[in-house]
Amino acid sequence: MNETLKEELLQSIREVKDYPKKGILFKDITTLLNYPKLFNKLIDTLKKRYLALNIDFIVGIEARGFILGSALAYALGVGFVPVRKKGKLPAHTLSQSYSLEYGSDSIEIHSDAFRGIKGVRVVLIDDLLATGGTALASLELIKALQAECIEACFLIGLKELPGIQLLEERVKTFCLLEC
């Protein structure tokens, strides 16, 4: 990806201090979505990255991974599969717990998300990689459905947190922007 696009993306992302709690500098991608030409460039860049890899599905993590993932799935002409917080999917699901700073949470995927096809090739996508807990739990769900995660893709990877390193130990990991 060219440096000009990286700079444009960085400039389009709003930073909100002390959100959702004191001491956090939140990276708000909703401002990027206000620039359709830039958003198109982003999706086109990702499309070029994955077009020749014979991807069957894009798996998006709730909630901003849905935005990036569905646009990328459309661009690639492949299916989109949501990974959601526990209790948000209507049919039979598989669930995976993961640790939070104080406690734990769970995410789910429909048990028939890949239409029962074993060995499908997927890309996991979300807007931001911080500690890696949600992404690692998502990888476990993908594996449980006997799919192969080709790469985990994030718009932003936070270098000062362990997520990038933890994920790279499990799957090829790509962060467009490292902050």
From Swiss-Prot:
One Pfam family here: Pribosyltran
GO CC term, one of those recorded: cytoplasm
Kindly state which reaction or reactions the protein catalyses: AMP + diphosphate = 5-phospho-alpha-D-ribose 1-diphosphate + adenine
Where this protein primarily resides, as one coarse class? cytoplasm
GO terms under biological process: adenine salvage; AMP salvage; purine ribonucleoside salvage
- Give, as one word, the top-level EC class: transferase
Give the UniProt keywords, A-Z.
Cytoplasm, Glycosyltransferase, Purine salvage, Transferase
The EC code for this enzyme is 2.4.2.7
- Signal peptide annotation: none
Q: Which family does it belong to?
A: Belongs to the purine/pyrimidine phosphoribosyltransferase family.
What's the subunit arrangement here? Homodimer.
NCBIfam families listed in its UniProt record: apt, PRK02304.1-3, PRK02304.1-5
Annotated function: Catalyzes a salvage reaction resulting in the formation of AMP, that is energically less costly than de novo synthesis.
Report what the protein is called.
Adenine phosphoribosyltransferase
Q: Which organism is it from?
A: Helicobacter pylori (strain ATCC 700392 / 26695) (Campylobacter pylori)
